[in-house]
Amino acid sequence: MTVKQSEASRLGPIFDVCRDDGRAALIGYLPTGYPDVTTSVHAMVALVESGCDIVEVGVPYSDPGMDGPTIVKATEAALHGGVRVRDTLAAVEAISAAGGHAVVMTYWNPVLRYGIDAFARDLASAGGYGLITPDLIPDEAGQWLAASEEHRLDRIFLVAPSSTPQRLAMTVEASRGFVYAASTMGVTGARDVVSNAAPELVGRVKEISDIPVGVGLGVRSGEQAAQIGGYADGVIVGSALVSALGDGGLTALRALTEELAAGVRQRAAAS
């Protein structure tokens, strides 16, 4: 079975531009509200200015079962600071105003509490391109699929090395924009060695679809970004950016983002 990427994808043209440049897209994640709401928004704009093609705007959640310790600590701080979903939507607006491309990454419970259609409507109004839902599977996403069609939003589901062929095909078919490939089993976090399972997982998706594949869960350096950019359409970085922001503020965040952006372009120069 071959699954054709939907022409209605909002993110598709961004991946097309990167592909024309001979490189992967750089996708950076930060949680809203860390270390505080205002700084987090400035940080996301800094990602755009420093070379991120797509910014993942995180909605802090009290039970982040798939996040590593760095992101858990940051989201706990954001929640203690009183962050709200509306702050995430404001961050999306700021990214859009800066010429960037924002998707929201959230566990499903905050969307249910907000209201699925209302969230989709407000995300689209803020200039968002789509939603990454790590704990939502396509079988249980009927209302979200309908809302994403109504409001022209991309829907990014996760696949993992453990995904069966049937599960992989179902997830890819339900996705639009890109598929999020978990390069290691378990929770997220920066690692010194990127999982060998990632190229195989990307290859499995490519066998059945032309949808772009983003690989995350471990990148921390420009060298790793170049490595992953050799086989993936998108290089996703989260924990390392959160650490840079927490340890060195906007200056360190910009420096790491520029290194990562150079990394995906190194791959282009080598190809």
UniProtKB/Swiss-Prot annotation:
Q: What is its EC number?
A: 4.2.1.20
The organism's place on the tree of life at top rank? Bacteria
Q: Which GO terms describe its cellular component?
A: cytosol
Q: Which family does it belong to?
A: Belongs to the TrpA family.
Provide the species name. Mycobacterium intracellulare
Gene encoding it? trpA
Pathway listed: Amino-acid biosynthesis; L-tryptophan biosynthesis; L-tryptophan from chorismate: step 5/5
Active-site annotation: 56, 67
The job of this chain, per UniProt, is described as:
The alpha subunit is responsible for the aldol cleavage of indoleglycerol phosphate to indole and glyceraldehyde 3-phosphate.
Protein's name in the database? Tryptophan synthase alpha chain
Q: What reaction does this catalyse?
A: (1S,2R)-1-C-(indol-3-yl)glycerol 3-phosphate + L-serine = D-glyceraldehyde 3-phosphate + L-tryptophan + H2O
Quaternary structure (record): Tetramer of two alpha and two beta chains.
**Keyword Lyase listed:** yes
Keyword terms, alphabetized: Amino-acid biosynthesis, Aromatic amino acid biosynthesis, Lyase, Tryptophan biosynthesis
GO MF annotation terms? tryptophan synthase activity
Family annotation (PROSITE patterns):
TRP_SYNTHASE_ALPHA
Q: Does the keyword Transmembrane apply?
A: no
Checking InterPro entries in the record gives: Aldolase_TIM (IPR013785), RibuloseP-bd_barrel (IPR011060), Trp_synthase_alpha_AS (IPR018204), Trp_synthase_suA (IPR002028)
